[in-house]
């Protein structure tokens, strides 16, 4: 039987293990002085896959920008990967972003660099020093997304789906506990979008990150399991499963 001190340590460890990877409590999402969303409450735990829906201009992307500290927190409380967004200093924001895998709709690859050099650029920017280890890690994540034979291609030589796979590989470089994906299939045709979603689901099943995916594509959350949040009327609410399968 554990003594009292050991029991307290066990409870503390359990609390740490169970701490949400993404949490927003009573947050007002602001863009300059404009109130976008009010009283936002979101909790995402390790291993959860959560969709964030809403019309254009409803505030979905502003939530992502708040979570990566691009938009400052002005009201409420928020933590991401153990970083307190209320207290975070500008000098600490790069360390926060190393814990986040961010995937955008438009890929945002460096068009004048090869696939491998795109990844090496990120590794160097996030503190990696040894080139051999950097190349090995780049090859590892490219293999994870099925792009290991494309390392020396230039982005313009790749299809849209292939560019998005590289963007996902880039997001995985530092083993992030949280993945934030902003319309990652928005520029892709239906078949390519399905391939990318299957890749996301494979990564999620294997590594169990917390995933928040912004999308307007209702077919995604019908075909692939996950919680569903919706931005509407200046707030965020959770959709019941039986409702969103009927939409």
Predicted regions and their residues:
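Conserved ABC transporter NBD signature motif
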Residues: 76-84
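Short coil-to-helix segment of the ABC ATPase nucleotide-binding domain corresponding to the Q-loop/switch region
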Residues: 112-121
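A short, proline-enriched helix->beta-strand linker immediately N-terminal to the Walker B motif
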Residues: 173-177
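Conserved ABC ATPase signature
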Residues: 154-164
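Helix-to-loop junction immediately C-terminal to a conserved catalytic motif
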Residues: 68
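ABC ATPase NBD coupling module
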Residues: 85-101
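Catalytic Walker B motif of ABC-type/P-loop ATPase nucleotide-binding domains
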Residues: 179-182
């Amino acid at each position: 039987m554990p003594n009292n001190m050991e029991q307290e340590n066990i409870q503390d460890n359990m609390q740490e293990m169970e701490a949400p990877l993404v949490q927003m409590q009573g947050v007002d999402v602001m863009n300059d002085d404009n109130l976008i969303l009010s009283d936002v409450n979101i909790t995402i735990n390790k291993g959860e896959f959560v969709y964030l829906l809403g019309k254009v201009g409803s505030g979905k992307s502003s939530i992502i920008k708040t979570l990566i500290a691009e938009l400052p927190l002005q009201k409420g409380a928020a933590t991401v990967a153990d970083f307190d967004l209320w207290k975070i200093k500008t000098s600490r924001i790069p360390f926060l972003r190393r814990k986040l895998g961010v995937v955008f709709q438009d890929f945002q690859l460096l068009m004048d660099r090869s696939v491998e050099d795109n990844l090496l650029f990120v590794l160097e920017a996030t503190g990696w020093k040894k080139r051999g280890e950097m190349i090995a890690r780049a090859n590892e994540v490219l293999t994870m997304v099925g792009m290991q034979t494309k390392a020396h291609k230039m982005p313009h030589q790749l299809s849209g789906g292939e560019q998005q796979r590289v963007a996902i590989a880039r997001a995985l470089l530092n083993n992030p506990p949280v993945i934030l994906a902003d319309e990652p299939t928005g520029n892709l045709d239906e078949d390519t979008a399905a391939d990318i979603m299957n890749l996301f689901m494979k990564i999620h099943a294997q590594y169990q990150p917390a995933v928040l995916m912004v999308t307007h594509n209702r077919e995604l959350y019908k075909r692939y399991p996950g919680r569903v949040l919706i931005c509407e009327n200046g707030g965020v609410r959770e959709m019941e499963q039986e409702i969103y399968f009927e939409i």
